Amino acid sequence: MNIVMFFFDNYMFSDFNKSSLEIACIENDIGTVKKIINLNPNLDISHCLNLAIESKNYQIVKFLLKKNISNSVLLEAYDCACINGKISIMELLIQYLNNKSIVS
């Protein structure tokens, strides 16, 4: 295996995807969010979820909630929505949390 390709595939590309995902969450670009997550489903999306909440990007928040998110990340997202006064997103998170068993 080419060492340059190994490095690109395992380090730089995932960093590039994470930065692109963060920008897409802020800019409400759901198409890009879906493409990046489908290409790399193991990306840590917790920070991106908070960025989408802060930017009031409801559809992106809704999409990210469909991913396997830990209870602690969900509770942090709810705190972020409360702090930023994002009522529609708070309601979405409450609805989602009510349908999920919360055990810390």
UniProtKB/Swiss-Prot annotation:
Q: Which residues cross the membrane?
A: none
State the source organism's domain of life. Viruses
Q: Which InterPro entries match?
A: Ankyrin_rpt, Ankyrin_rpt-contain_sf
| ANK repeat residues | 16-43, 44-73, 75-102
Is Repeat given among the entry's keywords?
yes
The reply to whether Transcription regulation figures as a keyword in the UniProt entry is no
* Pfam families in the record: Ank_2
| Alphabetically ordered keywords of this record | ANK repeat, Repeat
Q: What is this protein called?
A: Putative ankyrin repeat protein L677
